[in-house]
Swiss-Prot record:
Name of the protein this chain belongs to: Aurora kinase B
Endoplasmic reticulum keyword on record: no
Family: Belongs to the protein kinase superfamily. Ser/Thr protein kinase family. Aurora subfamily.
EC class: transferase
Any Gene Ontology biological process: cellular response to UV
Designated gene of the protein: aurkb
Length: 320
């Protein structure tokens, strides 16, 4: 949620309320989770608190709190500190999203997934310690440039496909891939963030509607059960938006957008190359089983010809 802003005309679907009080699982003696991915607690197991961080400039503002650039004072680790207000989350009934985000993201290790290190809380707030992505939101970059060229878009497609394949192998569906939830690292590499809508699959093949209207697949609009193939549809929409500058089914009316999605009313401007059209058309299929698999996305001729992905050095990214 770095550099988060409300985006029009997109509409975020309201999650179901009534999930009970906020239950962030904490060790009462430490206020910090243990396990993989954490910013290590001091050797004396001192409770983490806001006093352990130097707080810098705000990186973004969201409905439930803000994100700040911060540095852990002892370890000198630069991170993004996401500050969420408990009362606001309880009021909106989204505590389950926080628990889900912590549960899922803390176990994910991939160069194109934003790292979740740790969390702690006080009486009124929950603090999430996240990897800092210095180049911010992809959406801001898209606003700045209008659209991306084939090389940049193909690079993003390879990165997001590799990250999602990793998620799907771990039975995690993201369900909310969109430029606002994709951050950019030091080298401009894509980082999937905001796992609040994610679910473990296949045990939770839900019919609930979530995500952003322009990115919703037909099966979710039509109320059918869905699986990891919703993410295939989303990256097809993402590819189109990166190349064109707006989503493929966007209209001024929600009802008309729904209709265009369910009919897969896909129209390409002349600026979209044949290779990109082929890839997008193979992802934006009404039938989930007909959508191009992630491995085939990474091996698609247009992606192979245009992607400039650079893998990071193979070394531990754990702070010491």
């Amino acid at each position: 949620m770095q550099n988060k802003e409300n985006r029009e005309p997109r509409v975020q679907q309201t999650p179901s309320a009534g999930v009970g009080p906020l239950r962030v699982e904490m060790n009462p003696d430490t206020h910090a989770v243990s396990g993989p991915g954490r910013v290590p607690v001091k050797s004396n197991s001192k409770v983490l608190s806001i006093d352990d961080f130097d707080i810098g400039r705000p990186l973004g503002k969201g409905k439930f709190g803000n994100v700040y650039l911060a540095r852990e004072r002892k370890l000198k680790v630069v991170i993004a500190l996401k500050v969420l207000f408990k009362s606001q989350m309880v009021k909106e009934g989204v505590e389950h999203q926080l628990r889900r985000e912590i549960e899922i993201q803390s176990h994910l290790r991939h160069p194109n997934i934003l790292r979740f290190y740790n969390y702690f809380h006080d009486d009124t707030r929950v603090f999430l310690i996240l990897e800092y992505a210095p180049r911010g939101e992809m959406y801001k970059e898209l606003q700045r440039y209008g659209r991306f060229d084939d090389q940049r878009t193909a690079t993003y497609m390879e990165e997001v496909s590799d990250a999602l394949q990793y998620c799907h192998e771990k039975k995690v569906i993201h369900r909310d891939i969109k430029p606002e939830n994709l951050l950019l690292g030091y080298r401009g590499e894509l980082k999937i963030a905001d796992f609040g809508w994610s679910v473990h699959a296949p045990s939770l093949r839900r019919r609930t509607m979530c995500g952003t209207l322009d990115y919703l697949p037909p099966e979710m609009i039509e109320g059918h059960s869905h699986d990891e193939k919703v993410d295939l549809w989303s990256i097809g929409v993402l590819c189109y938006e990166c190349l064109v500058g707006n989503p493929p089914f966007e209209t001024a009316s929600h009802a008309e957008t729904y209709k265009r999605i369910t009919k897969v009313d896909l129209q390409f401007p002349k600026l979209v190359s044949e290779g990109a059209r082929d890839l997008i058309s193979k992802l934006l299929r009404h039938s989930p089983s007909m959508r191009l698999p992630l491995r085939s996305v990474m091996e698609h001729p247009w992606v192979k010809a245009n992607s400039r992905r650079v893998l990071p050095p193979v070394c531990s990214s754990e702070p010491h």
